[in-house]
């Protein structure tokens, strides 16, 4: 091909750039409404005729295309009912691409879906066309058939002799069509791309884009030197419907020689996919008795092939229908939309409840010879309508019930209804239309059996009604279908017999109230409390008895019910509440079995003046001087008005001292004041009689005693302590006697204590006069002591070395002391016997003890060093070494004579002369 060749305009066939995104629809359980593609592309010529079809968009609403409408946002294009896009007028497209939006909307749900339509304008020339090239355009040739044609890339023209430069213009290369599923051999050449500059300089060619250097990789390749482009493997339109590549031309140094051009490669569809139903089983329903043409359901099948070609155009048909009753063609299907509708009348749920329809979908526009097919099952359920009125199984029913029974089922009414059980079309509703004007009965529906239960809701008396003839009508909860009339068997008669039973007697007036005055004597006839036996035809006798008579005041005649008093009726009794006394009586007949009824008699007791007033208070206190205070008195009466106040308070004339000492002042009808009449009354307790009289007819009087304590009072009128004692009934002499008794008792207690102390002193003295043979100090006592000092720290060792100082020791407090300690208390003095002292006796006694200790090998210190605990400073004992037992000086033992006769022997031992 040379640069001077003419431009041949190649007419491009209409094809859409489709994207493969169909999934395996057999695994989907739900349908998603919308366009099959989001973006549709088609190649068109620049001149478009009015009504010319450009492409077809495919839309699925999942319920059929019925009610789906299309519109565009361009006035130049419209969409038909089948999705075909066409021009509304003759157009000359000025640009290389036109885009607009197609909208599908459902008129029933008002939902909308959008898709974009792109129209590409192709402008090419061919050297074989015989036409001259147009100015301003480069020659670009594209021929996919071998031998491949050369495609010239645009390049800038040189400046002509007039100094003008042609303007460079980019071109849209016509798409390259590649059939899918090609068997090769591969690589298979598609086209050769060549620049018109390759005669001047060496050029290298390359391609980029999806399918070249982007996944999927290396689907297409190009010879860098010759510019021949190849496809390397079979294509699948369902994976990629189109490819967009860019071709590049550079010199050997990598410098761009030409601008990149766009290459569109479309995979030509082949019918290699069967239609697939969205669901393998479809469920629909239609009312029984529906007219022909009634919509039932929609089945939808999708084909992965190109929907704009016959490969993807699916048509539907019904293969079989089971059962074929009442006709083998009860339904039909719209071949394009998949809508199933009724085609014949006679749908009856009571005969056929469900149909199974096999639907076939075939592509190639339904051509069974060339198209691929698939099937699905449509289950059509015939829904119930109320076209069968309920009918009684019998024209009459009967039952019986004892009188006075309620909530008792008398009879069960059975009905038959051929509609669907336990649905509003089957559930029965019963209604009594005649025979029960008083409303004694109702008919309730058993929810399980649908039977009518005739129930007594209001007690029936055999003596008034012995039988009932009811008329009952039955209907359904749902109204009957149009054109269906009620059956004469929807009404039945019910005969109900009432059985007589022994009814209990009853008191016509219950509770019965009578009024009378209290205090009527026993045997008084009060009233006749009789009962009535409702069993008038049995001629039974009624007997009466008491059931409750708390105070046992009444008696009833067993045959006629006459009530008399058995005791005096007292309104003020504890058995009377609010002036009413209540008793209950029993009336029993002699039927088999006997029946009884109760009646209550209420007696309202009218008050009479039978209770005298009582004075209040019973005790009080008052000052011994009359001008300080007084006692307020009143009265209490068990009766009621007018048999109570105003009261009259007065003092009796006997004894005369009462009126002499006391006086009563009336305050009002209920109160008075009791005060002293004299100027002074000795303190004490006084019983003051007062006569109280009520205002009854006749009036009653009562003499009551009030105990009054008279006592001295302080300035505030309150009794003082002495006064309170005196007011308790003790005189001055009694008080003095009590005080003397208290003093005598205290004196006796003091004497007893002194005697006990003296007895204690004598006991200690006797212990000092015990014989030496009995002295426990001569006994050998073993103590678990290992040295140290005395445990008895209270013992005064100074008395051993300074006995003369004992006379100056102060008296010690009474308590426990040593038996060898001299008492320090006051003692009677005895005359001192003249004695010659024997100062050597004590020395001999000590020396003898020392000798015995030295000769005793068992006595301490065992020739060993003894360590004694330090007893602290201040000890009056001093050092043991201070004891001087070898002194021959005279010792004065005269102080022993001061110890009394009990120590006479000891004084004689140390106070006498020396004995040889």
Swiss-Prot record:
Organism domain of life: Eukaryota
Topology, Cytoplasmic side: 757-916
GO cellular component, one term: catenin complex
Gene3D superfamilies reported for this sequence: Cadherins, TCF3-CBD (Catenin binding domain)
Expressed in which tissues: Expressed mainly in brain but also found in other tissues.
GO process terms (BP): adherens junction organization; axon extension; axon guidance; calcium-dependent cell-cell adhesion via plasma membrane cell adhesion molecules; cell adhesion; cell migration; cell morphogenesis; cell-cell adhesion mediated by cadherin
Annotated glycosylation sites: 283, 412, 557, 632, 661, 702
Domain (Cadherin) ranges: 170-277, 278-392, 393-507, 508-613, 614-724
Location of the region described as Disordered in the Swiss-Prot/TrEMBL record: 124-168, 806-838
Localization terms from the record: Cell membrane
Chief localisation class: membrane
Positions with biased composition (Basic residues): 129-138
Propeptide stretches in the record: 21-169
GO molecular function: beta-catenin binding; cadherin binding; calcium ion binding
Extracellular side: 170-734
Keywords assigned: Calcium, Cell adhesion, Cell membrane, Cleavage on pair of basic residues, Glycoprotein, Membrane, Metal-binding, Repeat, Signal, Transmembrane, Transmembrane helix
Signal peptide residue numbers: 1-20
Pfam families the record matches: CADH_Y-type_LIR, Cadherin, Cadherin_pro
Spans traversing the lipid bilayer: 735-756
Annotated membrane topology: Single-pass type I membrane protein
Record remark on domains: Three calcium ions are usually bound at the interface of each cadherin domain and rigidify the connections, imparting a strong curvature to the full-length ectodomain.
Role played: Cadherins are calcium-dependent cell adhesion proteins. They preferentially interact with themselves in a homophilic manner in connecting cells; cadherins may thus contribute to the sorting of heterogeneous cell types. May play an important role in retinal development.
Name recorded for this polypeptide: Cadherin-4
Organism classification: Eukaryota, Metazoa, Chordata, Craniata, Vertebrata
């Amino acid at each position: 091909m040379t640069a001077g060749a003419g431009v041949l305009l190649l007419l491009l066939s209409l094809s859409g750039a489709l994207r493969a995104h169909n999934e395996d629809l057999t695994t989907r359980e739900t349908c998603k409404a919308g366009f099959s593609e989001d973006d549709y592309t088609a190649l068109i010529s620049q001149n478009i005729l009015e009504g010319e079809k450009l492409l077809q968009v495919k839309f699925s609403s999942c319920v059929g295309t019925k009610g789906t409408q299309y519109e565009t946002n361009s006035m130049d294009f419209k969409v038909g009912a089948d999705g075909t896009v066409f021009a509304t007028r003759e157009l000359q497209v000025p640009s290389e691409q036109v885009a607009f939006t197609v909208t599908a909307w459902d008129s029933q749900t008002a939902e909308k879906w959008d898709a974009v339509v792109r129209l590409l304008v192709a402008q090419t020339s061919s050297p074989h066309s015989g036409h001259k090239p147009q100015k301003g355009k480069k020659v670009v040739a594209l021929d996919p058939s071998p031998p491949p044609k050369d495609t010239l890339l645009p390049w800038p023209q040189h400046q002509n002799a007039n100094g003008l430069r042609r303007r460079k213009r980019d071109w849209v290369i016509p798409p390259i069509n590649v059939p899918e599923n090609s068997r090769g051999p591969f690589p298979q050449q598609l086209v050769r791309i060549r620049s018109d500059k390759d005669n001047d300089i060496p050029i290298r060619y390359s391609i980029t884009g999806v399918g070249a250097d982007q996944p999927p990789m290396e689907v297409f390749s190009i010879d860098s030197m010759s510019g021949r482009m190849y496809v390397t493997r079979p294509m699948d339109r369902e994976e990629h419907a189109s490819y967009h590549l860019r071709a590049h031309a550079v010199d050997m140094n990598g410098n761009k020689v030409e601008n990149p051009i766009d290459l569109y490669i479309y995979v030509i569809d082949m019918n290699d996919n069967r239609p697939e139903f969205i669901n393998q089983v479809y469920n629909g329903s239609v009312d029984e008795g529906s007219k022909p043409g009634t919509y039932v359901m929609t089945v939808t099948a999708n084909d992965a092939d190109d929907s704009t070609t016959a490969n993807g155009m699916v048509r539907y048909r019904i293969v079989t229908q089971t059962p074929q009753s009442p006709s083998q063609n009860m339904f039909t299907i719209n071949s394009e939309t998949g809508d199933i509708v009724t085609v014949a009348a006679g749908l009856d749920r009571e005969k056929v409840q469900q149909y199974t329809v096999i639907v076939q979908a075939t592509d190639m526009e339904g051509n069974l010879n060339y198209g691929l097919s698939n099937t699905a099952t449509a289950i059509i359920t015939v829904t119930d309508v109320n076209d069968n009125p309920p009918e009684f199984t019998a024209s009459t029913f009967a039952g019986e019930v004892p009188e006075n029974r309620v909530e008792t089922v008398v009879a069960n009414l059975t009905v038959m209804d051929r509609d669907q059980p336990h649905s509003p079309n089957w559930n029965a509703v019963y209604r009594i239309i005649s025979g029960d004007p008083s409303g004694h009965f109702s008919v309730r529906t058993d929810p399980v059996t649908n039977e009518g239960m005739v129930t007594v809701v209001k007690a029936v008396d055999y003596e008034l009604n012995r039988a009932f003839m009811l008329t009952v009508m039955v209907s359904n909860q749902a109204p009957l279908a149009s054109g269906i009339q009620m059956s004469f068997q929807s009404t039945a008669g019910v005969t109900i017999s009432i059985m007589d039973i022994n009814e209990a007697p009853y008191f016509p007036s219950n509770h019965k109230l009578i009024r009378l005055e209290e205090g009527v004597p026993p045997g008084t006839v009060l009233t006749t409390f009789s009962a009535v036996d409702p069993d008038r035809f049995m001629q039974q006798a009624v007997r009466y008895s008491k059931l409750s008579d708390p105070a046992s005041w009444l008696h009833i005649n067993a045959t006629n019910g006459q009530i008399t008093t058995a005791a005096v009726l007292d309104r003020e009794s504890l058995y009377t509440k609010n002036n009413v006394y209540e008793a209950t009586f029993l009336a029993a007949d002699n039927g088999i079995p006997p029946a009884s009824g109760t009646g209550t008699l209420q007696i309202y007791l009218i008050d009479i003046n039978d209770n005298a007033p009582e004075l209040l208070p019973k005790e009080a206190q008052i000052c011994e001087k009359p001008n300080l205070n007084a006692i307020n008195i009143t009265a209490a009466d068990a009766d009621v008005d007018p048999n109570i106040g105003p009261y009259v308070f007065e003092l009796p004339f006997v004894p005369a001292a009462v009126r002499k000492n006391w006086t009563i002042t009336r305050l009002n009808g209920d109160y008075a004041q009791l005060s002293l009449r004299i100027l002074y009354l000795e303190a004490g307790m006084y019983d003051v009689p007062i006569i109280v009289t009520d205002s009854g007819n006749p009036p009653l009087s009562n003499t009551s005693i009030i105990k009054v304590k008279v006592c001295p009072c302080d300035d505030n009128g309150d009794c003082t302590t002495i006064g309170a004692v005196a007011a308790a009934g003790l005189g001055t002499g009694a008080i003095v006697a009590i005080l003397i008794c208290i003093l005598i008792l205290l004196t006796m207690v003091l004497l007893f204590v002194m005697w006990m102390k003296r007895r204690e002193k004598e006991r200690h003295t006797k212990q000092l006069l015990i014989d030496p043979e009995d002295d426990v100090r001569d006994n050998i006592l073993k103590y678990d002591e290992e040295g140290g000092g005395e445990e008895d720290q209270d013992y005064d060792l100074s008395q051993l070395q300074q006995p003369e100082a004992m006379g100056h020791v102060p008296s010690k407090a009474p308590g426990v002391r040593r038996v060898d300690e001299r008492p320090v208390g006051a003692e009677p003095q005895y005359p001192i016997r003249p004695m010659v002292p024997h100062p050597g006796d004590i020395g001999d006694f000590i020396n003898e003890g020392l000798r015995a200790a030295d000769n005793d090998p068992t006595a301490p210190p065992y020739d060993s060093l003894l360590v004694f605990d330090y007893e602290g400073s201040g000890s009056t004992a001093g050092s043991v070494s201070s004891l001087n037992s070898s002194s021959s000086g005279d010792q004065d033992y005269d102080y022993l004579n001061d110890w009394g006769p009990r120590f006479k022997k000891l004084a004689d031992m140390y106070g006498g002369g020396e004995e040889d």
